[in-house]
From Swiss-Prot:
UniProt xrefs under InterPro entries: Ribosomal_eS26 (IPR000892), Ribosomal_eS26_CS (IPR047864), Ribosomal_eS26_sf (IPR038551)
Disulfide bridge positions per record: none
Highest taxon listed in the record's lineage: Eukaryota
Entry keywords, A to Z: Ribonucleoprotein, Ribosomal protein
Protein name listed in UniProt: Small ribosomal subunit protein eS26
PROSITE patterns recorded: RIBOSOMAL_S26E
Gene3D superfamilies: Ribosomal protein S26e (3.30.1740.20)
GO biological process: translation
Record's keyword annotation contains Transport: no
Listed Pfam families: Ribosomal_S26e
Length: 112
């Protein structure tokens, strides 16, 4: 039978079984190695409100940083595709195993 992907859509290589996790979006049971995982760091206070709060004088201490939320989201393949976290690639593009470039993230340059 033909195979669609070299790793069969999983990163289990050599393990007999892996634990299941629940999708963040739909609560479907998904093998942990197959789930699409994303780690989000978001500020609790949005940027528009930071200036207003700082102007009030409550948190105008030099170097004060507002707290941020740290959330690890795990999605099943269906929800990841539906919410555009991952995209369907053509047959030729599926063979490319390098990680796609992330927009807005600069590569570290070598120090001279």
């Amino acid at each position: 039978m033909t195979q669609k992907r070299r790793n069969h859509g999983r990163s289990k290589h050599g393990r007999g079984s892996v634990p299941y996790i629940r999708c963040t979006n739909c609560a479907r049971c998904v093998p942990k190695d197959k789930a699409v995982k994303r780690f989000y760091i978001r500020p609790i206070v949005e940027n528009a409100a930071v200036k207003d709060i700082s102007d009030q004088g409550v948190f105008n201490v030099k170097g004060y940083k507002f707290p941020r939320t740290y959330v690890k989201s795990q999605y099943c393949i269906s929800c990841a595709i539906h919410s555009h976290i991952v995209r369907v690639r053509s047959v030729a593009d599926r063979k490319i195993r390098t990680r796609p470039s992330r927009p807005g993230v600069k590569k570290p340059t070598a120090a001279k």
